[in-house]
Amino acid sequence: CGLFDEEYEDADGGEFNFELLTEHPFDCLNQELDVFVNVFGIYVISHSSIPTEYVEHSANVLAEFMDNDADGVMDDPEVHRFLVENNFVVPVWTKALREEVFPSLRGTFCEDNLGWAASMYYGNDDWAFGGIKQAGTWDTNLEEIWHVVSVGWYNTYPEYFGDRTGSRLADAMDAARGGHFLTVPNSYPEGAWYTYDDYTCDYSCQMHEYFYWILMANIDALDPAYTNKCADSEDEWYVCTKDELQQIDPLAYDLLNNQGFKLPTRIPSGSYRGLSGRETS
């Protein structure tokens, strides 16, 4: 089927299967990497030294973010189109492997024609196999893979989600921080509920983190009933549930729920169910 066909079905009309591939269509990625998963035209890229269950879990989380209701249709075709046309990739690797890959891309097509936003690091990041509700631990995939997917949202709907001053997302973040701070302030105003203090994180970077936090709260991924993530993050963000988001951050709640956008509403668990309702992991 074509890259932008509405539905993704295999020849039998069943679920979309995420096959582990040994080559990427861009040969420049094949020099140091040898495991790839095509998730609706967006590639998870990895290496055979990484256990396959980690790669497959990340691929399934990506699929769940793109088709959260698992009906086989991209939740937002324009966000999907942006990510595919700009060749975004989701690396699952180690820092040592990363240091081998990037030099191999210099002077090749891949150097300037791939989309990079975030990575999953085997041995450092956390995978919650079976999902956070079952595992009882946080899944770093929920953050890092959303950082990739969200680039499509920033660029497709700049008035609403643009990662710069003036968008609705920026206005909501300014309210959450207690003011418009282009750089991290020495201290946040009393009453602020988004208080990220990484001085290397500029305004757009602060927005990326904020978009992640409000989405996680909105899908109840931070609910203390599941993991300790919200309590562990209270020095940066303490809004744990959709109900709390509505009460504490009404601008974010309205943006996510009342403006007609089809954002994720279910917590990705690493088990994309596709068209048939069967898990692919």
Residue ranges of predicted features:
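Generic detection of long, well-ordered alpha-helical segments
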Residues: 48-56, 202, 242-246
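Short amphipathic alpha-helical surface micro-motifs
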Residues: 25-28, 70-74, 193-195
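Pan-zinc metallopeptidase signature
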Residues: 211-281
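Post-HExxH zinc-binding segment in Zn-dependent metallohydrolases
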Residues: 153-227, 233-237
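Intrinsically disordered, low-structural-confidence terminal and linker regions
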Residues: 1-17
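Sequence contexts marking disulfide-bonded cysteines in secreted/extracellular proteins
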Residues: 2, 27-29, 109-111, 231
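Acidic/His-rich structured neighborhood in mature extracellular/periplasmic domains
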Residues: 32, 39-185
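Start-of-domain marker
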Residues: 17, 21-30, 39
